[in-house]
Amino acid sequence: MKKIKILITGGCGFVGTNLALYLNNYFKIECADNLSRKGSRYNLNLLKINKIKNYNFDIKDFKKILKLPKYDLIIDCCAEASVEVSKKDIDRVVSTNLLGTINLLKKARYDKSKIIFLSTSRVYGISKLNSLVKSKNINKKLNIKKLINEKDDTTGAKSIYGLTKLSSEMFIEEFSYAFNLKYIINRCGVISGPLQFGKQDQGFISLWIWKHLNKDNLNYIGYGGHGNQIRDVLHITDLCKLILIQIRKINMINNKIFTVGGSSQSYTSLSELTNICQKITNNKIKIGKKKITSIYDIPYYITDNKLVKKTYNWEPKKNIYDVVTDTYMWILKNKKKLIKYF
């Protein structure tokens, strides 16, 4: 039987590399990545070891995209995913996140490829998410409130990053309507696990672990500086397993949007994450307070996985302790190689 041929864009990023390595056991995988991100060359070496080809170019270059082979499926993981960067460098974020996706859609149209698009929880309006927590100074532990699903409000300000991803979703739906493109859109919350090189505004789980392991300082930022903001966290392996199921069923189940996250099975506040990191690393570090809240920050987000569970009989198997432990073990094993990336 002929192997399905898949292109993963952003293939040397955290999600893209994990997906490529996982799906390579089942399909013919190739990647495209311009190697602009920190850590991408580390991940490129892993692809080479596993004989996965990477095309080194920018997906904004449509002429180069057209020269790529024909694929049965494109998985679009390429994004400038930092909310704060999106405020400072609008042109780069729009050209990468939106125009890059449009180029892939044109390629998919010509080749009659299907597409799986990794979107974000940031498509939802900030004011609606802020309304879930009344106080701007969260000085006590939050309880689980509403779970966010596919039908929740996407109107209003959401960050330039979130806007580009929502706009990409709309272009995908238009291409589906006009050109019979088959697609799946996954609106993912926080994703973490091995191969993630963390920063303050992106990849905070791996950053927290790295700082504890190296006895370096951190800050709780916003909402009074108490560290009580809550996010659900999806282990990258759980996401890979879901996408494998989606690929196998895409001829039967397509043209749908799913919210995908750790949900109530895997969530944490920053203060709780600190406690977990202290236990795992056996190190206690200084945590400062920065009380001023970014206009793009939100106090609470937990995904409702009801639809994706009903559709694919899938739910996360790994909890927040698994996420932290697995990431810690990867960092510990490769610490000398990773120093220049954190």
Segments from the language model and where they lie:
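N-terminal Rossmann-like NAD(P)+-binding domain of SDR-like oxidoreductases, especially those catalyzing
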Residues: 1-189, 326
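C-terminal substrate-binding subdomain of Rossmann-fold SDR/epimerase-dehydratase oxidoreductases
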Residues: 18, 57, 213-342
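Generic anion/oxyanion-binding catalytic loop in active/binding sites
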Residues: 36, 75, 82, 90, ...
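Flexible, glycine-rich phosphate/dinucleotide-binding loops
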Residues: 38, 124, 192, 227, ...
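Activation loop
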Residues: 43, 82, 204-208, 297, ...
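Residue-level signal for the nucleotide or nucleotide-sugar donor/cofactor binding architecture
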Residues: 60, 88, 96-99, 152, ...
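Residue-level recognition of oxygen-bearing side chains
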Residues: 64, 70, 92, 99, ...
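NAD(P)-dependent short-chain dehydrogenase/reductase
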Residues: 129-146, 160, 170-247, 273-280
